[in-house]
Structures are given as C-alpha cells and as structure tokens.
Amino acid sequence: MLSQVASGFTEFDPPKGRPSTADGPLGWPGYDEMRARAQDRTGETESVVCGTGRIGGTDAVLLGFEFGYLGGSLGERTGDRIEAAHTRARELRLPVVTLVATGGSRMQEGMRALVQLQRVARQTALTAAAGLPQLAVVRDPTTGGGWATLAAGADVVLGLPGAQAAFAGSRVRPPEADPAAYTVEAQHAAGHIDRIVPEAELPTALSRWLTLLGGSADRPQRPEPVPVPYALPGPTACGRLPDSGPEAVARARAAGRPRAAAYLDAFLTGREELGGDRCSGTDAGVLCGFGVHEGRAVAYAAQCGTPTRPAGYRTVARLVRMAGRLRIPVLTLIDTPGAANGPEDERAGAGPAIAEVFTAVAEATVPITSLLIGEGGSGGALALAAPGRLWVTPDSYFSVIAPEASAAILKRDPDQVPRTAEELRLRPQDAVELDVARGVVETAHGAARTPGVPRPELRPDEE
C-alpha cells in the first residue's frame, strides 16, 4: 500500500538490532523457520517497512505494516524499526503516516514483544511533543497493541471500509460478541476514528490532511490570531442591532439565520473534520476540524445551534490541544442554547466535559479568536469563548442562562419572560458594554455596528 499512497518511497536501512538468538528471545521452537517462510512469502524481513515518501505535495515518514509477515505482529525488531523511523521523523521535521495492519504482539517473543508497546508509545509521545502531526490508516485487521498505540493514538485516524478495528482480536473475543462492534464503522460511530475512506480515495485524503497539519516546523511558536469573520446577513434586520432583549433572542433563534456551516464555508477553504471525542462518541451539533484562510491553516470549533452534548465538548478540547501542539491558531463559533442536560448527558459526564474545554482554552498555547453567531446560552456557550478575544454578531445574544430558565429560577410567571430578557441585558451591544465582548462585527455587506466600536481586527501584538 505504500506505493499506492506515496511517490518516491525510499526505505530506511534496517537499524542495527541486538544480537539475534536462535528462535528468538524465548527460544520458541521453529520460530526462525516461521520468519524465513514469512520472508519468502512477502519479500520482507520484518512486519513493518519504514522510509520517506511524498504524499501530494508533502514529504513524510511512512510506516507500512505487512500483514503477510506473521500477521503484522510486533516483535523486538519491529520495535527497533518503529523507534528508528520516529527518530528520523524528528530529525527531518517530517509528519508521520502509519498504515496499520496487525494482529498485535508477537506470541513467539512473549513479554519481550509486549513491552515493545511501551517503546512505541514513547516514540509517538516524543514525536507529538516535537509538534509533528501523526496520521494513521486503519487497515484490515488492526487489533491488539497496534490499535492501542500507533492507530488510536494518532492525531488523525482514517479507516478503510469494513476493516476490523479493536483491541480484542477475532480469536479472543467473547463467543457471543457481535462482530459488527469490532469494525471501523463501529469505532467511527463511537468517536474513535475520524473518517472512513475508500481505498481509492486514500491518497487524496492523506494529502489534504498533510497540507493542513504539515509544516509545523515553519510556523512561529506563537502564530498570529485568526482574523475575526464578518457577520453573515440574517433574514431580517439587515445588520441593525436589536432594540430589546426579546428582539435579540428572537433574532438569534430565527430559523433562517446563518449557522456555523455557512460561516465556515464563507471563511475557510479545504476543510477537513475531526470525527469524534476519542472517548464515547460524536455530536452532530459541533463541527471541529481544520481549514485554510488566506493561505494558512486554521483550526475551528463551531456549535451549530443545538444543545451541546458531552462528546461535542470533548471534541472541542481535543481540537484545541492538537492545534496547540501543531502551532495552528483557533477560531471558535459559538451558537448554543446551552449544554445538553438530559439524564444521558449527565451520565456521559457533561460537567467534566465542559471543564475540559474551559481548561483547554485557558491553557491554550496558540491564540483563539471567538465569534458569537447566535445563541449564547450560559456556561455551555462560554466554554468556547476566548477571554478577551470574543466578538458578537448583530443576530446574537449572550446570557447567564436562557430567559425562560431565568424566569423559572426567579419563580416568575411565564408572561414575565420578556421582562426577564430585558433585565438580563443580553443584547450583543450589552455584551460589549459589560466588557464581555470586544465588539459587534460588521455584516458582510457593511451594516451598522455598535457606536464607538471599531471594526474588529486582531493585530499580532494582541495576545
């Protein structure tokens, strides 16, 4: 598969390993003969082939597993090669792409094989700390330690349709287990794989991701902030600021108001999305990924106007942390009535998930630019707002809680909701006056803005 995804592949010389003993570290009867037969069958001397190649317009270090060599299993010499490949990647400042197809640790080497997972994990951690992106392609099968380190631990995980992907291999699962639970499709639905890609489309998909994430060696330690997008015109009001709290709420909730996808399409090109939180699932109401604005990569996290679920918050936190390591500035688009608050959301860890986002934003090592494009409902919205770098659109509101909920907390009758909305001072211009937001952005056609507030532009020194 290496030749299918990369041009000009040049294999590394195998590292000088430890002295070989007959039949391996355990003296497993017939092990040398097994390796010899595997070499005759595949033409390879180990289960992984490593080298450099070019994917699209990006040079990368590639690791390709050969499942025909003892089931792609990881042994001591496999660990030697993976360690050497990651070391070269850090020396050359190149991203790492791993094409995984493995049954796990090599039985014939026992614990000496199992501890290779620790070596692999250390190497991937060092490469991540060096700010280099790691992509993994899950082929059939990807099980055991290979799934739990090289595949599931990558920044971006792509899966081939129908491939097995699981920690438990097919021969060690419970007999009553549903085979569908151990597939790429199941892992994607659970938020562990970002995208399922047909094999014919894999070179293009890898090229797009490397274009977005590669080049971290050339990025400044502290990149310039993302400029603030213009507001998109809504169905009514033509950019005029709302006169009252109830009007602000009504405009933010209007069915025809532009949503996050429209803003992203207008602001970014070449978008690629992350597909989950790497924990429990996905949230269709949150879009996270990377795109290009005026020639440079931008990470984005955008709420789509629905209550945000725990998986959505964890995906946002994942994105912010990844962007920090890769030195890519972040844009957040805020639009939610609040965090999802059903029993299933509490069981899924709504509080800890929101805390993850607050922490990720507070600790961010790259600048975050935030724009409120619709509803700003309580802490579920505030979690995505960068302190000191928040702007608001004319069709938005930001409130400590939705006015209906506020009235209920204050034990007011439902007919007091409009009064409550007024008293909360939740209009976009109120957010500016209360020093919550820096300004109200202009609409794309140049409508009015808050008097005295200049058109928002972030300068490099505004950090």
Annotate the PLM regions.
Residues 128-129, 303-330, 348, 359-366, ...:
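A structural preference for long, well-packed, hydrophobic secondary-structure segments
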Residues 42-46, 72-84, 276-285, 308-319:
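Glycine-rich anion/phosphate-binding loops
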Residues 73, 108, 251-252, 342:
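Active-site-proximal flexible loops/turns
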Residues 32-34, 63-71:
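Glycine-/proline-rich flexible loop or hinge segments
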Residues 53-66, 81-106, 290-304, 314-341:
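A structural preference for short, pocket-lining loop segments at secondary-structure junctions
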Residues 1-55, 203-298, 302-307, 449-463:
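Intrinsically disordered, low-complexity segments enriched in small/flexible residues
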Residues 102-221, 338-462:
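Conserved catalytic cores of soluble enzyme domains
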